[in-house]
Curated annotation (Swiss-Prot):
Its main location: membrane. The gene is Slc39a1. The chain crosses the membrane at residues 31-51, 69-89, 105-125, 180-200, 207-227, 238-258, 273-293, 304-324. It catalyses: Zn(2+)(in) = Zn(2+)(out). The lineage of its organism: Eukaryota, Metazoa, Chordata, Craniata, Vertebrata. This is Zinc transporter ZIP1. Ubiquitous, except in the pancreas. Highest levels seen in kidney, salivary gland and placenta. It is found in: Cell membrane; Endoplasmic reticulum membrane. It comes from Mus musculus (Mouse). GO terms for cellular component: endoplasmic reticulum membrane; plasma membrane.
Length: 324
């Protein structure tokens, strides 16, 4: 109504309609990132498998191949350590705090740390159940009943289950293979959430920025994951399959995020944060009780291994710093 009681005229402004695009902002960027991430991560996952398989075909190069793989794995261990402490944990804590704040929930109980602990104990319980079942079905070996904090011995290694895959003498394959599967699962789950972060973006510039950062991050992580799996007594075909699975997770998250961009709410974010916290807890266990102890257990080239470990940590730290 006007100031004197007469009805106001409704004025149609074309610019108001034109300002509402029918296509979500950044959709072409998301689709392009989906394809690029799939191809780049797949290539980076399969390159170590192909290189080590070709070099492993020459038995004379086995000894040098073992040492090279161990050194490169130390570099990958630094990448995983930085991923755990500087990427997974901060992302999880920020996401769950934001979800709780959006729901106006105030807790005195340390829920964030409790979820991390549940992910940690999940892997611990799974490993103990696996070891208990293995001991009941076959005569226990002294090396198989060692504590989970124990590391592989410093004895010689031999090539097993195909070229390019070292197996330490006396080291049980079941826990190592289980830890490898948990590692792939935790990284895959986190990759889905990283893809969701891109898919849920409504700003074109921000979506493009996240895509470029993920291209670098996932490329390095894919190489590190393949190197880690090659030391877990898994067949080449299994390692390649894990690489393909890992490569599909971030594009899957981008697709889901683009589809759910309009319906995402605080409850969805809280559920996502809980799953991400469980994944971070499992990754915490794998990093500190599997990757680092195994790489630093032997007495050969200790200083060089530490330098490579720090180099891997510094590389991902610099990448995360550039993202900021």
């Amino acid at each position: 109504m006007g100031p004197w009681g007469e009805p106001e005229l409704l004025v149609w402004r074309p610019e108001a309609v034109a300002s509402e695009p029918s296509v979500p902002v950044g959709l072409e960027v998301k689709l392009g990132a989906l394809v690029l991430l799939l191809l780049l991560t797949l290539i980076c996952s399969l390159v170590p498998v192909c290189v080590l398989r070709r070099s492993g075909a020459n038995h004379e190069a086995s000894a040098s191949g073992q040492k090279a793989l161990s050194l490169v794995s130390c570099f990958a261990g630094g990448v995983f350590l930085a991923t755990c402490l500087l990427d997974l944990l901060p992302d999880y804590l920020a996401a769950i705090d934001e979800a709780l704040e959006a729901l106006h929930v105030t807790l005195q109980f340390p829920l964030q740390e409790f979820i991390l602990a549940m992910g940690f104990f999940l892997v611990l319980v799974m490993e103990q159940i696996t070891l208990a079942y293995k001991e009941q079905t076959s005569p226990p070996h002294p090396e198989e009943t060692r504590a989970l904090l124990g590391t592989v011995n410093g004895g010689p290694q031999h090539w097993h289950d195909g070229p390019g895959i070292p197996q330490a003498g006396g080291t049980p394959a079941a826990p190592s293979a289980l830890r490898a599967c948990v590692l792939v699962f935790s990284l895959a789950l986190h990759s889905v959430f990283e893809g969701l972060a891109v898919g849920l973006q409504r700003d074109r510039a921000r979506a493009m920025e996240l895509c470029l950062a993920l291209l670098l991050h996932k490329g390095i992580l894919a190489v590190s994951l393949s190197l880690r799996l090659l030391q877990s007594h898994l067949r080449v075909q299994v390692v390649a399959g894990c690489g393909i699975l890992f490569s599909c997770m971030t594009p899957l998250g981008i697709g889901l995020g683009a589809a759910l961009a309009e319906s995402a709410g605080p409850l969805h974010q809280l559920a996502q944060s809980v799953l991400e916290g469980m994944a971070a807890g499992t990754f915490l266990y794998i990093t500190f009780l599997e990757i680092l102890p195994q790489e630093l257990a032997t007495s050969e080239q200790r200083i060089l291994k530490v330098i490579l470990l720090l180099a891997g940590f510094a590389l991902l730290t610099g990448l995360l710093f550039v993202q900021i």
